[in-house]
Regions:
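Detector for methionine-enriched segments
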Residues: 1, 167-170, 177-179, 184, ...
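A diffuse structural propensity rather than consistent per-protein peaks
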Residues: 48, 169-171, 224-225, 230
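Intrinsically disordered, low-complexity segments enriched in small/polar residues
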Residues: 92-99, 103, 107, 213-217
Length: 524
């Protein structure tokens, strides 16, 4: 206490006994991908689209990072860390808005087509490198005679496959489908529209287009799994994100661009996605948004989810199918992986409703169409295995229609439960830092109980916890039972917290019965 030696009035500041816990943010995303310029392997914060363009350049044809970041901000995201992997350090420190950078941003993947080959009333040409061939085969199942399957192979490996039709104006028209989905070939009409017909079953070998400059091969520019995984000591790849605490969502949209170009196969895709999931599990405060391979129907994605990928994690969520969005680099609509838009939907949902609300039944802004229209019967097969579907509803737009993790544990089935626990854990962790080195006695235990309870009662009042009274929604225990003498002697203070989170109304069931007034209920 201070000493008072002379008469007078003294004012003392007394610390308040209450130290309120504040909720942390849950809407900061991280994107790992390719860009024509910008810092290499350095997490860079951008808070709007203009900042991204200044640091990493505009939309780049054939890559998805810029589209994903744009979709994130368009759907309500406010802050994101971007990690540029692959490429060279030549563009580091350059002004991405300079004429040279803008020119480079629009063309690194846009190689001139190779020599076109005849394919019936169509022509096909290669835009990628490698020993490419195109095979025309019969379509699966019954259907009109103009239907066929177009298979693109790099050597003996199938790298792209399209179920198409030769009938112009149809959704599956071969020219439109290849233009929107292929990164390796282009198809053009070689006859008037009335004369277009299904090509005969055949295989044609394509001559790859030559890179415009030495080393400009787009496949070579794609990083391998090791570059994505990175190293925490060197702060590269996913390892570089370990130093950024505020990240809550992670996506790797350009992984599928590398797969489409044949730079990596599905085994490498799985290795990177497993590394992404492992990173989120290691950090314990973020969730991975997984993109499926393109061009898969509901049956194929079910097989891929269960047999090929087989992921089982409460820190990851899978969304299907790909969405169609406008591509300013080509002036046309393009299919892009949904992870960037989904991360924005999560951020918007957290801001408008709270992280405790499942990020589903939300409109995907910027999506003009879907790669595949999913029926209710198909979703009946996909939803139980953790595939969150994106569906188009008449008069309601394109919406996220699933909110599950990839976990087989029923306790962590719902995505909002996992993300809400991340929010609580991080908030309590940061809000109780003052406890360290305080005297470990009953007074400290009471202060901890009071502060944590004050935080949780506000969560209950906001509708995040289940129960009609606070006692039914949570409990906080920090006393002699949780802190016996042997625990106190080693410098530990243990607080036990239990909560009852609100789970989403995933299945809304109305039971209707017919009854006659005065005569009771009528049964069928």
């Amino acid at each position: 206490m201070p000493s008072y030696l002379s008469p007078g009035v003294y004012v003392e500041e007394v610390a308040s006994g209450s130290r309120p816990i504040e909720g942390v943010g849950t809407s900061v995303a991280a994107f790992v991908g390719l860009a024509p310029t910008g810092p290499l392997n350095e997490p860079t914060l951008v808070t709007n689209w203009s900042q991204y363009v200044a640091a990493f350049g505009e939309f780049t044809q054939g890559y998805y990072l810029a589209h994903s970041v744009y979709g994130f901000f368009n759907n309500g995201g406010s802050a994101a860390y971007v990690v540029r992997v692959g490429g060279s350090r030549q563009g580091e420190g350059a002004d991405a808005t300079s004429p040279a950078a803008v020119k480079a941003a629009g063309t690194p993947a846009a190689l001139p087509p190779g020599e076109p080959q005849k394919l019936g009333t169509f022509t096909v040409a290669a835009v990628g490198s490698g020993d490419l061939s195109v095979e025309v085969a019969d379509a699966e199942g019954d259907g009109p005679e103009e239907r066929f399957k177009l298979i693109v192979k790099d050597g003996r490996k199938t790298v792209e496959s399209f179920d198409v039709t030769a009938k112009k104006g149809q959704r599956a028209y071969v020219v439109t489908q290849v233009q929107e989905r292929s990164r390796l070939i282009t198809v053009a009409e070689a006859a008037p529209g009335a004369q277009l017909a299904r090509p005969e079953n055949q295989t044609v070998v394509l001559k790859a287009s030559a890179p415009a400059t030495p080393g400009a091969d787009p496949v070579a520019s794609h990083p391998g799994p090791a570059e994505y995984l990175g190293d925490s000591a060197d702060r590269t790849g996913f390892g570089g994100l370990e130093a950024v605490d505020e990240i809550s969502t992670v996506a790797v949209p350009d992984l599928m661009a590398a797969y489409q170009r044949g730079a990596i196969d599905l085994e490498a895709v799985k290795a990177v996605q497993l590394g992404l999931i492992a990173h989120c599990e290691l950090m314990g405060d973020r969730v991975a948004v997984i993109d499926p391979p393109p061009g898969m129907n509901a049956r194929q994605i079910r097989v891929w989810r269960q047999e090929t990928a087989g992921y089982d994690s409460k820190y990851a969520a899978l969304y299907y199918p790909w969405i169609k969005s406008f591509d300013p680099s080509s002036g046309q609509t393009r299919l892009i992986p949904p992870s960037g838009h989904i991360a924005g939907v999560w951020a918007r949902n957290d801001f408008e409703r709270g992280v405790h609300k499942a990020p589903a039944n939300e409109v995907v802004r910027g999506a003009v169409d879907l790669e595949t229209q999913i029926t209710r019967g198909e979703q009946d097969l996909l939803n139980p295995i953790g595939v969150n579907c994106i569906r188009a509803f008449p008069g309601r737009g394109i919406r996220v229609w699933g909110a599950r993790t990839l976990s087989s544990d029923p306790a962590w089935r719902y995505l909002n439960i996992r993300r809400y626990f991340n929010y609580l854990e991080e908030s309590i962790l940061l809000g109780t830092q003052w406890v360290v080195f305080e005297p470990n006695d009953h007074a400290l235990w009471a202060r901890i109980r009071r502060n944590v309870s004050a935080f949780l009662v506000n969560e209950w009042r906001s509708g995040a916890l289940f129960g009609q009274r606070p006692e039914e929604a949570y409990y906080v225990k920090c006393d002699e039972e949780t802190n016996p003498p042997e625990s106190v002697d080693v410098g530990r203070v243990i607080c036990e917290i239990g909560i009852a989170p609100v789970k989403p109304a995933e299945f809304v069931i109305f039971r209707l019965a017919q009854f006659s007034s005065g005569n009771g209920e009528l049964e069928e």
